[in-house]
Amino acid sequence: MAAITASMVAELRAKTDAPMMECKKALTEAEGNMEKAEEILRVKLGNKAGKAAARITAEGVIASFIDGTIGALVELNCETDFVSRNDDFLGFANEIAKLIATQNPADVAALSALSIGDETVEAVRTRLIGKIGENMTIRRFQRFEGTKLASYLHGTRIGVMVAFDGDEVAAKDVAMHAAAMKPVALSSDEVPAELIAKERSIAEQKAAESGKPAEIVAKMVEGSVQKYLKEVSLLNQPFVKNDKQTVEQMLKAANTTVKGFTLFVVGEGIEKKQDDFAAEVAAQVAAAKQQA
């Protein structure tokens, strides 16, 4: 068998981006044959991706890309906050944000079939799972086209993209405001019906407990719903930089119109696994007693 040299390991790592020890093991198994070692690594990295697929990915990053009047916002998830700061992971997020903007995929499946260099997005994802050792998923994205765009990233965990006409500084202020105040819709009439129904139900329960006449209760409920709509609609919210005016008033003064926006928060709505270490230890002790 040919001796496995450091230069061979380095060459295989450059070709596959796999960890050094994995490269050395593959070369040893392939008896120094570089092509065979590459095949071995592809299988191993693919197996790692398969094993990781069931693990929850509630951490990650938001990446954005704007080029003129096209842009995209994407959420790429991983398992831990540590990996969300990995350079390869961050680079992948930025690459797919650019792809979404320039190639206009219909959904995540279509995005996964697009190419980054000589690899598909899915192949890069699988390779990175094998290299980093954590599951990662492209959760969602939003693409914009045909309008002025502004974006704001709060670190890498909150991202906003705003479509607008008018002043770019005002639009960027709106993006920052949205990241801080997290509106659910541009205006009151765009708030999703299911959210309004939920808020109305809560208001009805609270009002019913007051013991007041039905007509008063009805007014209390309607007042609560209207207050909620103002609180969660972007244009009606007090502007974060000057709460004496609403966002709508600020935009009017800046002769700017916001056409729409998208707000992504990493892991929003994903149920994270909670490790109960006390229960885990108790289970291990019980199992040990049964074996004794």
Curated annotation (Swiss-Prot):
Its main location: cytoplasm. It comes from the Bacteria. InterPro entries: EF-Ts_dimer_sf, Transl_elong_EFTs/EF1B, Transl_elong_EFTs/EF1B_dimer, Transl_elong_Ts_CS, UBA-like_sf. Gene3D superfamilies: 1.10.286.20, DNA helicase RuvA subunit, C-terminal domain (1.10.8.10), Elongation factor Ts, dimerisation domain (3.30.479.20). It is found in: Cytoplasm. GO terms for cellular component: cytoplasm. Residues 80-83 are annotated as: Involved in Mg(2+) ion dislocation from EF-Tu. Belongs to the EF-Ts family. Associates with the EF-Tu.GDP complex and induces the exchange of GDP to GTP. It remains bound to the aminoacyl-tRNA.EF-Tu.GTP complex up to the GTP hydrolysis stage on the ribosome. This is Elongation factor Ts.
